Curated annotation (Swiss-Prot):
GO terms for cellular component: cytoplasm. Pathway: Amino-acid biosynthesis; L-histidine biosynthesis; L-histidine from 5-phospho-alpha-D-ribose 1-diphosphate: step 6/9; Amino-acid biosynthesis; L-histidine biosynthesis; L-histidine from 5-phospho-alpha-D-ribose 1-diphosphate: step 8/9. It catalyses: D-erythro-1-(imidazol-4-yl)glycerol 3-phosphate = 3-(imidazol-4-yl)-2-oxopropyl phosphate + H2O; L-histidinol phosphate + H2O = L-histidinol + phosphate. One of its GO terms (biological process) is L-histidine biosynthetic process. NCBIfam families: HAD-SF-IIIA, hisB_Nterm, Histidinol-ppas, PRK00951.2-1, PRK05446.1. Its cofactor is Mg(2+). Residues 1-168 are annotated as: Histidinol-phosphatase. In the N-terminal section; belongs to the histidinol-phosphatase family. In the C-terminal section; belongs to the imidazoleglycerol-phosphate dehydratase family. This is Histidine biosynthesis bifunctional protein HisB. The gene is hisB. SUPFAM superfamilies: HAD-like, Ribosomal protein S5 domain 2-like. Residues 169-375 are annotated as: Imidazoleglycerol-phosphate dehydratase. It comes from Xanthomonas campestris pv. campestris (strain B100).
Amino acid sequence: MTPILFVDRDGTLITEPADFQIDAYEKLRFVEGVIPAMLKLRDAGYQFVIVSNQDGLGSESYPQASFDGPNNLMLQIFASQGIVFREVLIDCSWPADNAPTRKPGVGLMVPYLQDRTIDWSRSAMVGDRITDIQFAQNLNIRGFQLRTEQFGGDWDWAGIAHELADAPRRAVVQRNTKETRIRVELDLDRVAEPHTATGLPFFDHMLEQIGKHGGFALDIRAEGDLHIDEHHTIEDTGLALGQALREALGDKRGIGRYGFDPVDSPWRVAGDTAQHGFTLPMDETIASAALDFSGRPYFVFDGDFKRERVGDMPTELVPHFFRSVCDASGLNLHLHVRGENDHHKVEGCFKALARALRQAIRREGTALPSTKGAL
């Protein structure tokens, strides 16, 4: 899914003269900060579409040739800096015509509204006039009004690029079935004490490890049919958490993607081939997690438990919880644990996953960590 940044031209990409017509080369001036901001947005995965009202373009008072020269030069300068527009959409009507193709109308948007590859949740409109904001509202996307002397506005290009490209990675997932009601809220870019309430105190304690050692804000609330058993509550919590991770990560641009142990980790156990992920000790126990946000869910568990349950959590549901997270998040996870104390082994698994997550979700730039072009 590709986000689109729809942009006005005059007053947004290039400054608008007093007569509101850029019909000569000497009138061509770029808005401050537009090129570095658009480069940042390009690197964040955005495509660009110009949507502009040009009153009476092609008429005697505004000949097409007078428009084409400065416009083509503008496009060439943008292209020379690595900024290419997917399309340039121009409405030539007069305001009195009330044409559906004239902003804030969305008549020119029909092909885009039919395009299922567009990520509308991240798409936005940038312009200098209130009609640009109304246009955004008609498309049900976010609108940014640039700050200008003529029309007001609250934004500059640097702020817009930061808001869209560096937006906090948050998600709120509500999963309701006849068996459970689960709510998961997380913010991958904010550190906060985790809050969990599932009706299963030991399970709550384990979920807290994910937020605490993963380094992100996590709030999980669950109501389930515990009068039957713990299965539905634990399983559905895993599914909701996995979905929240998937939504918060978005297209995964800029993340580390992988969580694993460095080759020279002091915690590696000689001769034990299971220790190949992020390896964590807990007294006599050692747990290892290696993961990949590949979009292809796969789970491998290597370990066993002697007790039927630890606290109120059946040990058979420990790997089942992690499998549920993988299925809903598109995560490939290898989890290995060795030890004697089952409490330590279960907790070690949760902590190892959390530390591997911390590494994988860390932002390391703006590139997509895949040669396929999508994750």
